Amino acid sequence: MKNKVRVAWISAPAFICVDKFIVPEVSKYMDVTWYIIAKENEVLDFEEQLEKLIKLGKINCKILRHKERNCDFGIIIWFIKFLKNIKREKYDLIYQVMIGMPFYMPLFRFYLGCKNVLIGIHNVKIPQGGSNYWINKLYVSFCIKSFKYFQTFSNDQKEQLLKIAPNKHCTSVPFVSMDYGEIDKSVKENKDVITFLNFGIIRDYKRIDVLINAAQRAYEITGKMFKVIIAGSCNDWEKYQNKIKYQELFELIIKRIDDNDVAKIFERSDYFVLPYQDIAQSGSAIIAINYDMPIIASKLPAFEEYIKDKKTGFLINPADVEDLTKTMIYILNNHYKIYNKLVNNVNEFKLNNFTDEKVAEKYINNFNIVLKKFKEI
């Protein structure tokens, strides 16, 4: 019997929400050891699910914790020890998600090289207004220059990378459908107000102010009552709160959302709204697709991959209050005519593109392509 390809899969807690679906599928065909690098006291999302998968023998997962912050010089010793252990294992392929800014990836390159390494890179283009913009930009630039093989999570990011570095090899996979538990569909059927949702960490480039202003204009023009749920943590919420004139329109859940509460928020919502000014890709949009929810989003390449205008949602001019207002008014006037068709279209798109098996198959194909290239060197 031919031995399975041995793969080290190295990532961080932020990616568990996706990897927990993919690693078990890939592990059916490859011998995967999944390393999760976390801070000592960091609470891991889905930890119970991971423990269950380990007990069932579906994954070989090692959670490794360090005391230091990524930016502390003391963490360098911890990283070096970990990387030396990986080197001793002599894996056929190392799949490394880009993590550990600013020290980890330079140390990885020094100790492990790039020959049998595939780098998973989420944001080739760093969104304007994101945290630590220039440091992130330099870190990504270093990685692209220093490694040969990459995997992005959208075709748009793949194209961005190949524009910057046409001599590199880059594949892409979609995000897996991100499932936070079942929803009670009768909740939507029995409620009497249309509900728009924005979910996720609130950052400047996501332009929550555009949603607030557009919702209030739509209310003033139509006089129709509806609901806008804004759910997610925010470091400077007061600047958004000051824009709200009609408190009755908004349900505000401004805090970190527990995983167990995500499905409950989505089951009460009809449309997902993302009026971003810039974006590389959006995990929250994939959650909406998982729950068959039509999306209103900015006309940006990252969203155009997933949203077909007037079929699975609506595309608006980026961060444009007037355009979003028009779209919300159209929905308020036509919701009961258009909604079921939109939902069915989203569901069909999900089944054709985002099942665990389909996404895992793309990972395996990409791994095999890169393994073949290693042998050709």
Language-model features and meaning:
Residues A8-S11, E68-G74, F82-F103, Y149:
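Short N-terminal targeting/anchoring amphipathic segment
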Residues K145-I183:
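Donor nucleotide-sugar binding/catalytic pocket of nucleotide-sugar-dependent glycosyltransferases
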Residues K337-N353, K362-N365:
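A short, well-ordered alpha-helix in the C-terminal region of glycosyltransferases
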